[in-house]
Regions:
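Beta-rich carbohydrate-recognition and catalytic domains
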Residues: 1-62, 67-113, 126-177, 200-246, ...
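Beta-rich accessory regions
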Residues: 152-385, 389
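Low-complexity, intrinsically disordered or signal/transmembrane-proximal segments
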Residues: 388-391, 396-397
């Protein structure tokens, strides 16, 4: 199962969940570790770092290590004996990554309607803690969602590690309004920025690519910021270096299906565009309704269909003022960032061979079309990829 990593000296400490099945096929989860050296060799740490707690079922996984004011901590998602989800906070004794002591269950105003907390991540934006997590089975009366499992977040005013508490916690919010974002992993970079990557693929959902033994992919790397109490997520600036050419946004009979659109929409306007469009105008429909204040994404006519039991459209409310949209298309992936990350739609799509056009169906959206070269290395990667101190490992649950 998934985990995280942190640089210690010349080694990268890998922290993850290992599962052992006994003769009765009962699962025993262990939080274990390994060291990745500069030579690329992995040496496993020959002991269990965190055992399954006595008050937890065998659903106990996904450790995230983080540094808070010079002290190393970790959180692990779990399910208690009442089949309710929780997040447990641990402290590294003397900052020794092989010696972990439980502090207690993280207090984040847990409503206790979810049966499992998967992939919890605690990241800091300034002094404010942001908890990203996947509350499986969350009661929709708490917060409505459309996907089989949600990915959500809460923001705190501050963090008290001694009490395992996020202080003055916000309401629960959907992290992404699209079809696929899950298990979002976040960390603080050396310069303090909060960065995140989402897994675009949901557990217990069959995908068209399954027949090729492939499922899921990563989102773009996103920087997290807080504005007016809202969490914004927007691709890191280095992504702009993938822009190979630019043209004025317009109808296009054919594209490479690897591009970015930077659109402007006037206040109180209504516009609809179709991406991955065929000659009949069938593809991903994106409707910007700034009269009623709503954005709707419809993939019901985009390629091979799947997961239709969870719906083929997604919507979210937006203000009716002038709006921007940055849309990234990469063959089977789309990511839509409204107002520079105020609202986000992420999803997969498996278009037919002739679905590669752009159609402005109604309205007068303006902007720029950027052809993207995903094979380019950005300056950010050249500067940081060799010595990034904090990574996240992901795996299917």
């Amino acid at each position: 199962y998934s985990g995280s990593a942190m640089q210690f000296g010349d080694n990268l400490f890998l922290f993850y969940t290992g599962n052992v099945r006994d003769e009765n096929w009962i699962r025993h989860p262990y939080q274990v570790g390994a060291l990745l050296g500069k030579d690329g060799k992995i040496t496993k740490i020959d002991k269990v770092l965190i055992d399954q707690p006595a008050d937890s079922t065998d659903h106990f996984r996904d450790p995230q290590i983080f540094n808070f004011k010079g002290q190393y901590y970790a959180i692990v998602g779990g399910q208690d004996l009442e089949k309710k989800g929780f997040v447990r906070l641990y402290k590294a004794v003397d900052n020794d990554y092989t010696n972990w002591q439980a502090v207690g269950n993280l207090d984040f105003a847990n409503d206790r309607t979810a049966y499992m907390m998967e992939c919890p991540n605690l990241v800091f934006i300034g002094e404010q803690p942001v908890l990203l997590y996947c509350p499986q089975g969350l009661d929709k009366s708490v917060l409505d969602y459309d996907n089989i499992y949600p990915n959500m977040y809460k923001i705190g005013a501050s963090f008290d590690p001694e009490k395992a508490q996020m202080v003055d916690v916000s309401q629960l919010h959907n992290l992404d309004y699209g079809f696929e974002a899950y298990a979002t992993q976040a960390f603080n970079a050396p310069d303090g920025r909060a960065l995140a990557v989402s897994w675009l693929g949901l557990p217990d959902v069959a995908y068209p690519s399954d027949r090729f033994d492939h499922q899921g992919t990563f989102s773009l790397v996103k920087e997290l910021t807080i504005k007016d109490g809202k969490l914004y997520q927007y691709p890191v600036a280095a992504v702009q270096e993938l822009r190979a050419s630019e043209e004025t946004f317009s109808n296009r009979a054919q594209t490479s299906n690897t591009y970015e659109l930077e659109l402007n929409l006037e206040a109180n306007s209504q516009s609809e565009i179709v991406l991955l469009a065929d000659k009949e105008g069938k593809g991903i429909s994106i409707n910007f309704d700034l009269v009623n204040g709503q954005v709707t994404v419809d993939r019901s006519q985009a390629g091979e269909q799947y997961a239709q039991e969870f719906g083929t459209t997604r919507s979210c409310p937006i203000d009716k003022h002038a709006t921007t949209a940055n849309i990234f298309i990469d063959n089977s992936v789309f990511e839509i960032f409204i107002n520079k990350g105020e609202k986000v739609f992420s999803g997969r799509v498996f278009p037919h061979a002739d679905q590669n056009g752009i159609l402005i169906k109604s309205g007068k959206p303006t902007g720029t079309y950027y052809e993207l070269d995903y094979g380019r290395k950005t300056n950010w990667c050249r500067k940081t990829c060799r010595r990034q101190p904090h990574y996240r490992l992901t795996g299917h649950q």
